[in-house]
Amino acid sequence: MRSPRTRGRPGRPLSLLLALLCALRAKVCGASGQFELEILSMQNVNGELQNGNCCGGARNPGDRKCTRDECDTYFKVCLKEYQSRVTAGGPCSFGSGSTPVIGGNTFNLKASRGNDRNRIVLPFSFAWPRSYTLLVEAWDSSNDTIQPDSIIEKASHSGMINPSRQWQTLKQNTGIAHFEYQIRVTCDDHYYGFGCNKFCRPRDDFFGHYACDQNGNKTCMEGWMGPECNKAICRQGCSPKHGSCKLPGDCRCQYGWQGLYCDKCIPHPGCVHGTCNEPWQCLCETNWGGQLCDKDLNYCGTHQPCLNRGTCSNTGPDKYQCSCPEGYSGPNCEIAEHACLSDPCHNRGSCKETSSGFECECSPGWTGPTCSTNIDDCSPNNCSHGGTCQDLVNGFKCVCPPQWTGKTCQLDANECEAKPCVNARSCKNLIASYYCDCLPGWMGQNCDININDCLGQCQNDASCRDLVNGYRCICPPGYAGDHCERDIDECASNPCLNGGHCQNEINRFQCLCPTGFSGNLCQLDIDYCEPNPCQNGAQCYNRASDYFCKCPEDYEGKNCSHLKDHCRTTPCEVIDSCTVAMASNDTPEGVRYISSNVCGPHGKCKSESGGKFTCDCNKGFTGTYCHENINDCEGNPCTNGGTCIDGVNSYKCICSDGWEGAHCENNINDCSQNPCHYGGTCRDLVNDFYCDCKNGWKGKTCHSRDSQCDEATCNNGGTCYDEVDTFKCMCPGGWEGTTCNIARNSSCLPNPCHNGGTCVVNGDSFTCVCKEGWEGPICTQNTNDCSPHPCYNSGTCVDGDNWYRCECAPGFAGPDCRININECQSSPCAFGATCVDEINGYQCICPPGHSGAKCHEVSGRSCITMGRVILDGAKWDDDCNTCQCLNGRVACSKVWCGPRPCRLHKGHGECPNGQSCIPVLDDQCFVRPCTGAGECRSSSLQPVKTKCTSDSYYQDNCANITFTFNKEMMSPGLTTEHICSELRNLNILKNVSAEYSIYIACEPSLSANNEIHVAISAEDIRDDGNPVKEITDKIIDLVSKRDGNSSLIAAVAEVRVQRRPLKNRTDFLVPLLSSVLTVAWVCCLVTAFYWCVRKRRRKPSSHTHSAPEDNTTNNVREQLNQIKNPIEKHGANTVPIKDYENKNSKMSKIRTHNSEVEEDDMDKHQQKVRFAKQPVYTLVDREEKVPQRTPTKHPNWTNKQDNRDLESAQSLNRMEYIV
């Protein structure tokens, strides 16, 4: 069974894995920061919108001030990539936002800075490009969902801004309203650099031990190094090859090595007199041999065994032989025969022979058998206080440390005699030391170090100058005091005049002026013309609470900022490519010439022969239409690696790190802040500095006595190595230089920006500043200059690089195709004809006697009629007919016009000679009352009878039509003849009646008071055409489409036309069917006769006289089909057409007696009910079988009915049209 301790071990690797994932996640973060904007103040005195209207709607007629509520002001912000020519379109690629409603017409929020209501924060997660374009708009909230919000004023700004805690203030002082705002860019926590894309988070754990400096560079904690500061610095001197460490100051040896610094190898075990270069070697010392170096190869030299000046010779390992001098013998010459003869005593020693050899009496300072050993007078050490003893012959010498003196260093030395104190009041000798009494401001043993009195003294970003025993704070503007701790109150002197409120700010004040005053001190009456809001040279007139711009003739708008479109309201004439003529009352000629603006806003047009032109461009622009901004960066005027950004007839250099100036020609003095401590001398480098340290100080800034490396020595993750007299930085990839401060490979090489875009280096990333006409991260998206569509009158817009061209449709001209070309300008019409200009053409209205497209053709002979001369081709109306003169012959349409309507009370003159005004019969009054209505008739004029009979169809030379009218849409006093006269005057009869004689007669219906039966007949019918059918079809079409302006047609509710039945195509069945039908008919007659006889016998007194039948104009009742028009449902212009074929059937009614009142009344009642209750108007064409006619047989009326209910209707052949 596992112990709990054993089970818990997997948690440690898991925690390490999680920590590693967190570290990797932190590395993925590319950039993080935020763009902040704060609204400071708003001044919209009149409460107006950008279009000049009031926020509340109405104005006071007296002073023209807005009288209703103030504006509900809020702001919108759009942040996008840098644009040299700011355009409002396109996405807000860097972000957008808005505030809530924060005030009315005028407000000031400077005293409440930090309020989130007037602040807009746009976070970003990309490398901040430094260059930007900002659009700020003030809006009036409508506070409802119906009316849209309205814009008050807008401002745009393009520039550069680096991340900083400081605010940058911007103002909008033109237009309707003035407002002030401030912006800044700040990096999120742990993000640094100009692009907020340098990530550095302090840590002290397994993955690193470092802090972060103000530039985001990792500064390793003491004892650590490496890009991630996770490599411990070993004990100084530790062999980098054979030693390592996991903790600072440690030195752990590899296997086979030993020593304090792991620089000594371990020899072979048992090696006696040998060394090693690699572990486990035994390299013998001189005169030693053997596998373990334990064999003495120089026994004579090592042991000196031969005595009495005997000569020793090595004969083998550990072997020797002594050659004795005269008087001595023995293996080691130890036996003396005449020992003193050889003078064995050295160093002035005296020899005495003895029985065993000799004996030496040594002189002072020497000892040993032969007086060859110097007596060590330094043993024991006679020197005190750490003095070093040097042995002499019969004596010694003490070398004393500086603090001591005397023969045996027993006396204290006076160090003050050497005057070691530099900036001291006095020097005091101490035992084994001294003490310097330093002057104020100095420290150190010798009082040679100036005390840094500046640490933590100056406030509010003031700079401190260190003095001797003191400091001086150099305060930034707006602060005072010894420590710059006091904000100077600029309002103490009450500088604001005229009741203005003074608001104290840092190094300045602002006067909040009351209404009616302006200026820095509220000393001026508000002059709305200063600064001049009027553009394009317009003159500004100051008013009590507003201003007025008197615009030049070519501009319009509140501020004269919009180019006036003269051709919008006044006809224009194209003179040439540069000039357009327009009517004007300001010139004696009545014509003013204006520019066509073909060269755009940056050029002037010059006309040339042949309709050509050239553009004289303003400075900074070129191209056919002056649409191209000249690249002022060509030739690269920026030096020392600076990046050039092109402007309009100008350029701007963005300098590399370490350089400044208009052309980046000046090296920034990195020594200006005096970074070298303790008297070190600073030498300026490019984007770096070097400190020449003194008095034993070391490091990048002379801050340490122990190491050349400090936390800021190597930049950009470089690793610092202490090399005693100097330091060396090991730079990571992409950086070089003594302190890793120079980028090796620029992210702009090769240039990633397309289409002439400028690449700006931003750390290890880049930003593209695109030329006009291009946009996108790398300037690959062509700006759509055709959006919104600038070409009028169906002109085609051709998009170019920062330009567009309108290709006009035929008949139009001008840069935006707004001008209709006057084709009548060349006077193309002949003989004084009138020319009417049209789009891409013209029309000539010819004078009498001329014809043709240009009236150059002379017409034929004139006509003389009714005593008047009529020119050839002329037309005139003659009652209901139209006449025309055709080469001397008068040709008129042939429509019978009927009796002329007249008014009884007007007396003579209304009727032609021989006719009189006869009152209209009561049954002829269609829309009552018809008081005073009459018709012109003569006693000799007989009524015209048409050739229509009850079995006539409009395929013949006759048509029977029944019109049902909506009398509510008709004027009172209309007679049947009035309606018939309007039908005869329809334009559709003009062309048809020129070839045929047309007769139209009308009778009121006896079955319904809102119906009129119309009979149309024609004479002179030819085989190649049927005018009656054509007229009938045109009338049906006119009613169904509600065509024309006739009030009569508009009042028609239903039309019924009698159709011809289809002929049987099976010819051989005709005789058979005729026989069958004849027999059947006879049977029916017999049956009917029998039934009538029986009925009369049952009811002999039930018969009465029947009402006269409605036979149209011939007293014959037609068999009709329904024509209905759905105008009440679908309107008067268009009517949908539907096919309801096979959905209706005929309901037959058989009548056996012509005089039966019940059946006749029932028939009339059914018609009235049917016509009165059908609200939907339909047009029905029906073809049906016609029963055989008898003199007493009346045609059947048919109702629409579902054909699925009557099987008998399946044999009928019909056609229906619903219009």
Curated annotation (Swiss-Prot):
Residues 34-1067 are extracellular. Residues 1-33 form the signal peptide. Residues 199-207 are annotated as: Important for interaction with NOTCH1. One of its GO terms (molecular function) is phospholipid binding. GO terms for cellular component: adherens junction; apical part of cell; apical plasma membrane; membrane; plasma membrane. Residues 1189-1200 have a biased composition (Polar residues). One of its GO terms (biological process) is positive regulation of myeloid cell differentiation. Residues 1182-1219 are annotated as: Disordered. It comes from the Eukaryota. Residues 185-229 form the DSL domain. Ligand for multiple Notch receptors and involved in the mediation of Notch signaling. May be involved in cell-fate decisions during hematopoiesis. Enhances fibroblast growth factor-induced angiogenesis (in vitro). Seems to be involved in early and late stages of mammalian cardiovascular development. Inhibits myoblast differentiation. May regulate fibroblast growth factor-induced angiogenesis. This is Protein jagged-1. It comes from Rattus norvegicus (Rat).
